[in-house]
Amino acid sequence: MNIVNSLDLSNITTNHVAAAVCAGIAVYAIVAGRNRGKKYPPGPKGHPLIGSLFEMPIQNAHVVYKEWAKTYGDMIFFKVLGQPFLILSSEETITDLLDKRSTIYSSRPRMPMVVELMGWDYTLGLLPYGERWRFLRREFHRFMSPTAVSNYRQIQENSVYTFLNNLVESPEQFSKHLRLFYGSISMKVSYGINVKSAEDQYLLDAEGAMSGFMEAGIPGRFWVDLFPALKYVPSWMPGAEFKRKAARWARLNDISLERPFKHVLDQLKKGVASQSVSATLIEELPDQNSPDRKEKETIARNISATTFLAGIDTIHSTTQAFFYAMAQFPEVQKKAQAEIDAVVGDKRLPTFEDRDQLPYVNALVKELIRWSEVAPLGIYHSTTEDDEYKGYFIPKGTIVMTNAWSILTDPVTYPDPFAFKPERYLKNGVMNPDAPRPEDLAFGRGRRICPGRYLADETLFMTSVGVLAGFNISPPLDKSGKPIKLKNERVGTITLTPPKFECRIEPRSPAIRTMIHDTAESISAL
């Protein structure tokens, strides 16, 4: 599917399109005149005015770009309606541009639908590079540095043990239990709120906001992303369905921002608030009579929401991929369980203190990050000034994508790339310091590297080791009792996830089943 097929054309009128096209042509003419004669990186030539509008893929874009790279190389350049795009498909180009020239390649492209109409301008990941971004990044780092993240380990362990008990009671609902699991960790860390159900209103609010983001965040999904002037069209006009959708999604976004933060404000006034990111930020606010109180409170609210939402969708998808992988690669599961049994024994469940003694499980987490690659093109970068690289001109405002999936499935670096092999990162039974580091691509690069990567890594480890200690995961059975072979497939656009699948999740022994239940009971009594 290309970008034209994916556009929401509901009720768009001829006048709207004509006006937008005229504006686009004017901008195109100005930019084209300024950059005429420049040597761009190789790529599809495109058509006059519209460029590669009909060639730019939406579905499986990472696969299409990998095919294009066979023709054009590790830098692919094209334009859509005058907007330049650059696809990077090698470690060398990503390092040279995003890391070594990060002052130029660290901004974000304009996203009229998501940012300007739906109100996602508060979130750190979508902010353009600048002083505001640097300030919020520093504030966010206070709560997501390796040292800060270590303070959340008890929350993570307790959440994992509760998740394991939910799997014991209703393993067929593991996807629902995953939603509750990650939502409960994020809600507890961000707001100090204990979430007990996947139908908790706080989680439903956040999921409503995220569903709008996932639909509208696809580049070019709506005409307004191609022609920003359309954002000024009144929402009551025929053809302005995108404005009405944006308004509905913006309301959901506002609710997910305001409701939990207001709860913490009220709890602090009563003196009963739990420790959390939002509680810390609120306690640091100036007096109510201070002239900048409102501004500071908004910043605290935004940082709290960013903490809650940071990576929740991608980590959820990665853990789904964990179950998907274990059901397909039983030999990996058995090796990991043998290591856990040797270190942890059968009298308790694993903790973070066991991590240094579990090299195979650590390698498994690395391979999970590579094999799942839930964000194959990451969040797009944008150049803030003209640049030249290897004799090629890269104009200001170019949208830059990194095809991490292509690199992480390169058979030269990762032989048999679609197999799940933790051994890639081991040497003589210990972690190999010279092995590839898939996390360096999966969590982004340069100054826009994911600030929540340490919490994500620890959560993935604790989830994986807990599930492997407690359960055997295997494919579902057909009517004759034979295992159904799972296909290694992915679905999605911005993020990828396994297609809807079933697997058997069974406690490894009656004793382990009892231990999981008793541990969860002791937590619920706290």
UniProtKB/Swiss-Prot annotation:
GO MF annotations in UniProt: heme binding; iron ion binding; monooxygenase activity; oxidoreductase activity, acting on paired donors, with incorporation or reduction of molecular oxygen
Cofactors, names only: heme
Protein purpose: Cytochrome P450 monooxygenase; part of the gene cluster that mediates the biosynthesis of alpha-cuprenene and oxidized derivatives. The alpha-cuprenene synthase COP6 is the only sesquiterpene synthase identified in C.cinereus that appears to be part of a biosynthetic gene cluster and is highly specific since it catalyzes the cyclization of (2E,6E)-farnesyl diphosphate into only one product, alpha-cuprenene.
CDD domains in the cross-refs: CYP64-like
Entry-listed glycosylation sites: 11, 302
EC number(s) given by UniProt: 1.-.-.-
Protein name: Cytochrome P450 monooxygenase COX2
Pathway the protein takes part in: Secondary metabolite biosynthesis
Keywords, alphabetical: Glycoprotein, Heme, Iron, Membrane, Metal-binding, Monooxygenase, Oxidoreductase, Transmembrane, Transmembrane helix
EC primary class: oxidoreductase
Keyword Heme: yes
Subcellular location: Membrane
Binding-site positions, heme: 450
Gene3D superfamilies, per database record: Cytochrome P450
Family affiliation: Belongs to the cytochrome P450 family.
